[in-house]
Amino acid sequence: MRDRISAFLEEKQGLSVNSKQSYKYDLEQFLDMVGERISETSLKIYQAQLANLKISAQKRKISACNQFLYFLYQKGEVDSFYRLELAKQAEKKTEKPEILYLDSFWQESDHPEGRLLALLILEMGLLPSEILAIKVADINLDFQVLRISKASQQRIVTIPTALLSELEPLMGQTYLFERGGKPYSRQWAFRQLESFVKEKGFPSLSAQVLREQFILRQIENKVDLYEIAKKLGLKTVLTLEKYR
């Protein structure tokens, strides 16, 4: 089973060396505990062993293991899609949301539209409704800016450099996400996003949680709350105070 770790990591081409080492360490530790035969019982034993770790460490390990378990299921190595869950008592202890380990979002996907939706929310804090309304005319790749129009208001947000290559192939369209020159519906967007996050081993992630991840990353980078509010199109910082 250990050789499957190498195969799993080989499919994660976008990961840094440090990220791969972290995955490898967590997965080897996981297999040391569950053994060669993965079952509901062995997974419960492993979860019990995690109980004394910090919440952030538990979430990291569970995330890595769930992605690995999904990989094994896809390859036919296990007969069921097993999944670890954070213990209820651990969830209650969490006072503030944690930054999730989402490097895998930058890797290739069978759901490219869902992937781009997720990245736009995660990296820019945009709402799905805002994303669906984006016209390519609102995008200036040379200056790395995007104009967001909402009701009677407009705001200009910076496009992260990493997203430029993702947007460039779509610049010949009318809308960023379209069919026959018309934008897709919110239901379509949520289905695409749902399929993508499930593929990456995060089936419970929603657009709201991804937007929260954007906020947490901004705060970790010491961005002022007023600047974050401006990026999100918020009139006040009241809803951001809880993240201090």
UniProtKB/Swiss-Prot annotation:
Cellular-component GO terms for this entry: cytoplasm
Top-rank taxon, per record: Bacteria
Main location: cytoplasm
Stored InterPro entries: CB (IPR044068), DNA_brk_join_enz (IPR011010), Integrase-like_cat_sf (IPR013762), Integrase_catalytic (IPR002104), Integrase_recombinase_N (IPR010998), Integrase_SAM-like_N (IPR004107), Tyrosine_recombinase_XerD-like (IPR020876)
Domain Core-binding (CB): 1-73
Database matches in SUPFAM superfamilies: DNA breaking-rejoining enzymes
CDD domains: INT_StrepXerD_C_like (cd01190)
Record keywords: Cytoplasm, DNA integration, DNA recombination, DNA-binding
Gene Ontology BP term (one): DNA transposition
Active site residues per record: 150, 211, 243 (o-(3'-phospho-dna)-tyrosine intermediate)
Matching Pfam families: Phage_int_SAM_1, Phage_integrase
Compartments reported by the entry: Cytoplasm
NCBIfam families linked to this entry: PRK02436.1
Family recorded in the similarity comment: Belongs to the 'phage' integrase family. XerD-like subfamily.
Protein function: Putative tyrosine recombinase. Not involved in the cutting and rejoining of the recombining DNA molecules on dif(SL) site.
Name of this protein: Tyrosine recombinase XerD-like
Gene source species: Streptococcus pneumoniae (strain CGSP14)
